[in-house]
Amino acid sequence: MLTPEKISDLVSDAVASIPYPAEPARLYQPIAYTLESGGKRLRPMLAVATCSALGGEVSKVIDAATGIEVYHNFTLLHDDVMDRADLRRGQLTVHKRWDDNTAILSGDAMLTLATMMIAKAPAEVMPEVLDLFNKTAMEIYEGQQMDMDFENRNDVTVKEYMEMIRLKTSVLLGCACRTGAIIAGASQQTAQAFYDYGVNLGLAFQLRDDWLDTYGDPLVFGKQIGGDIINGKKTWLLINAMTELRQELCDILAEDLDDEERVSQVRAVYDRLKLDERCHSLIADYARRAVSAIDAVELDDDARQYFTSLAVKSIDRTH
């Protein structure tokens, strides 16, 4: 299997090498701006790593892997418009630097570009890869709609929330892994095992994001701590607190408090309920499920270590 450094370099080079026409600049500059802003590149690395681990030719997966990354960033462009977010990865969001219409149209172009790149998968598997991508994209839109619907509800259950983050976040990681497996020529059973790995890893990552938003170090996390509380965002932490201490939490959220005091009081409720430790335990559980999903797959030691390490890092990552 390729080394982690080689996988990272391949993905970074592929994203940096996407050719953009010079005109119209207002369409393409925001795309370059978004893709040059960094990010973990987790999804394309999963596609490349899975293909490599299963003995596939990495050159055959790199276009699809890059397309998945372009698609992921398209969803962020539109999410930022819907959420009215000002910052993404420490810089102005596209709709703030340009305007809403630019963010929408550049996002549309990214969706088409992503589909074109994914369609470059080897001809013998291209229909399967494209079907998987389209199914995944529809699930992501369903998850985003659920997230928006939750904004107007105070009775969201943990089960509903977990289904929402599975759709909105996790299935794209599963798609990336399965795409790599398909292009490597793996069996359906192996492809499904890696899909399950990606979905469980995605759940661990999203739950850790929830945790970091409340308990992280702002200098390391790169975002304002307590943003989810301030914005009334439904997270695993808030939903559990609402289930157990609804009236007290509703009183705090309704009270005329400054942001710092509101975050402090809500976090105190979380602490009393030991939601910090309970969330951490659940993250570790999903990380274990990810590793267990590929237990039966024949992998060399380096490959198994790569995927195990990714899962373990999801438990205690700081950003």
Annotate the PLM regions.
Residues 11-14, 204, 290-293, 310, ...:
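Amphipathic alpha-helices that form helix-helix packing interfaces
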Residues 12, 16, 111, 174, ...:
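An amphipathic alpha-helix signature
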Residues 1-19:
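N-terminal amphipathic/basic leader segments beginning at the initiator methionine
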Residues 238, 290, 307:
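Hydrophobic, well-ordered secondary-structure elements that form the walls
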Residues 6, 20-250, 312:
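Mg2+-dependent prenyl diphosphate-binding active-site environment of isoprenoid biosynthetic enzymes
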Residues 286, 300-319:
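Short, amphipathic C-terminal "tail helix"
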Residues 245-297:
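Mobile late-domain/C-terminal helix-loop "cap" segments
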